[in-house]
């Protein structure tokens, strides 16, 4: 059972990086580790884990029993992957024909039981990307070509279809789902059992089937240190966008002066200009 060892770095280790340091590893004898797998320092591999293909796992990761990880996959440092997860498996896209697409996971993520994260497609980004400091609760599904930022929370049974983008500090409620190519902006909050068929702008709370806007995520912004003035400016922009019965172009024109004074509003303006599916209304 060959084990390769990787040099510790501050970023998720590249599959191509050579392993040159001497490491402290804890690997259960029932685990199956392929000869292309690269493990960092202090990695814990529990019973009946299967790791195959070009997989790189950074320092201080814990892989609980019965996890399956397939490559090409790069996993950063201090990630904790709980039992029965499937990480880096081939995507559920009928166009996929076995191309060597990838999954990249950052640092300090908690991935709870039965989560699934699939590699990308050549028709999409070619990779599925997960940032750092995220919590994926039980049964969360991250489909091919998704792009997930940092500091997000996905509650039980959250479902992301292919090509979805989730920006930083998003909270996703239990059983919520988002349509392929959808996007959720930074600091947004998606209610439990919500069905998203359109994009959710930054700071907005969304709920329902299909999801509608229900104000801004004021409590979340307060917890993250936004000033009262910035929160008021964000709410003013929200009112312009949703209460004045304007087109998106007209709303942007009225919100841009607010963003010039309060940079916290700029992500909303940028999001509105970039939205591909249109926003929830």
What are the residue ranges of the model-derived segments?
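Terminal amphipathic alpha-helical/low-complexity segments used for targeting or macromolecular assembly
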Residues: 1-30, 35-36, 41-42, 78, ...
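Structural signal for interior beta-strand "rungs" in well-ordered beta-sheet cores
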Residues: 21, 25-212
């Amino acid at each position: 059972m060959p084990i390769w060892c990787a040099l510790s770095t501050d970023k998720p280790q590249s599959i191509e990086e050579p392993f040159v340091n001497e490491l402290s590893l804890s690997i259960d004898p029932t685990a199956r580790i392929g000869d292309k797998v690269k493990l960092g320092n202090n990695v814990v591999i529990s019973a009946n884990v299967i790791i195959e293909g070009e997989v790189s796992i950074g320092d201080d990761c814990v892989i609980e029993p019965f996890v399956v990880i397939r490559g090409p996959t790069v996993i950063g440092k201090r990630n904790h992957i709980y039992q029965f997860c499937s990480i880096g498996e081939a995507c559920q896209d009928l166009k996929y024909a076995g191309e060597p697409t990838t999954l990249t996971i950052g640092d300090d993520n908690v991935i709870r039981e039965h989560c699934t994260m699939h590699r990308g497609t050549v028709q999409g980004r070619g990779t599925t990307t997960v940032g750092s400091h995220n919590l994926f609760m039980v049964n969360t599904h991250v489909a091919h070509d998704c792009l997930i930022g940092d500091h997000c929370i996905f509650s039980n049974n959250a479902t992301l279809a292919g090509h979805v983008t989730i920006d930083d500090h998003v909270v996703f409620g239990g059983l919520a789902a988002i349509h392929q190519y959808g996007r959720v902006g930074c600091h947004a909050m998606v209610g439990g059992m919500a069905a998203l068929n359109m994009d959710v702008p930054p700071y907005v709370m969304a709920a329902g089937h299909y999801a509608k806007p229900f104000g801004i995520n004021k409590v979340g912004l307060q917890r993250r240190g936004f000033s009262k003035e910035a929160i008021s400016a964000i709410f003013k922009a929200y009112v312009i966008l949703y209460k004045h019965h304007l087109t998106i172009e007209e709303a942007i024109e009225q919100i841009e002066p607010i963003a010039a004074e309060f940079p916290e509003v700029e992500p909303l303006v940028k999001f509105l200009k970039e939205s591909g599916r249109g926003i929830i209304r």
